[in-house]
Amino acid sequence: MSTRSKTATPDLPAPLRRRRVSRSRPRAGAPVWLFDLDNTLHHASHAIFPEINRAMTQYIIDALQVERAEADRLRNGYTERYGAALLGLTRHHPIDPHDFLRAVHTFSDLPAMLRAERGLARIVATLPGRKFVLTNAPENYARAVLRELRIERLFERVIAIEHMRDRRTWRAKPDHTMLRRTLRAANARMADAILVEDTRGHLKRYKRLGIGTVWITGHLPGHLPTTGRPHYVDHRIRSLKSLRLGTRSGRQKCSRLTRRTKP
């Protein structure tokens, strides 16, 4: 892992530094990569997740006037049940969702907290097809992380939790309706989508829709399972480097994943 700072130089080679995301009409059958953010594109368990969890618990204590143990129970229970604590809090309690997201994703020194793989920009840039970020985090935080990692411009769009809601309710991964609507808006087929994600529950739910699934385990905390390959996972990788086209194994993985997206 390496620390990114504002003064760090991008690890894109010169031709890729000039590269811009194409806005032309998408090619039918091109892979559509859906990258999770936390613990996928960077190591959130190192410092960011502990701070978010602490802030969430404190917010619940203050807003609902409950003890810490009850606040932790609500946070964990709603995350497991709905995919994001925000959904449970807004459905069952008088919580302002925007204030909650702002409060729990504010950091005194985000660059110092970030850890990411070396060569991340090169890995993402050389993958074939279209690339999106699909995260249950708020947009401001997601874009701040991507900017610090020098990879924001490599993604066609950042789909954050604010974009997942409809007129009636907030939604988040692993909601099926949200993913269908998201891909339809992107003019992308479900069969072309490949989700790269650390949360097995999200992969399991979305595999039912027929998308490709990549389970990344290298950033997961020690108490979570990281071995084996469940039936709903097409590929298990420890590092995004496993998808590098410059290596034989990476070419094989990408070939198997993208072969399924052909018309």
Give residue spans per PLM region:
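N-terminal helical cap/lid subdomain that shapes the substrate entry/recognition surface
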Residues: D11, L16, P26-F35, T40-G119, ...
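Catalytic-core regions built around general acid/base machinery
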Residues: G119-P128
